[in-house]
Amino acid sequence: MPKIKTRKAAAKRFRLTGSGKFMRRRAGHNHLLEHKTSKRKRKLAGVALVDKRDVVNVRLMLPNTH
């Protein structure tokens, strides 16, 4: 039986926390930032948790995370 492969694109985007939740970056903080307020940019800079509806799909893409 061959090994199960990890989706590398997903591995670069998601990190598993110690409590078993997945962290992700927020969208909209790479470019075109000039017109966004400082408050909005600060909030976009932080990490967010993956919604519970999406966790199943993330786990399927990252089979070797526990």
UniProtKB/Swiss-Prot annotation:
One of its GO terms (molecular function) is structural constituent of ribosome. Keywords: Ribonucleoprotein, Ribosomal protein. GO terms for biological process: translation. Gene3D superfamilies: 4.10.410.60. It comes from the Bacteria. PROSITE patterns: RIBOSOMAL_L35. Pfam families: Ribosomal_L35p (PF01632). One of its GO terms (cellular component) is cytosolic large ribosomal subunit. Belongs to the bacterial ribosomal protein bL35 family. HAMAP family: Ribosomal_bL35 (MF_00514). This is Large ribosomal subunit protein bL35. It comes from Synechococcus sp. (strain JA-2-3B'a(2-13)).
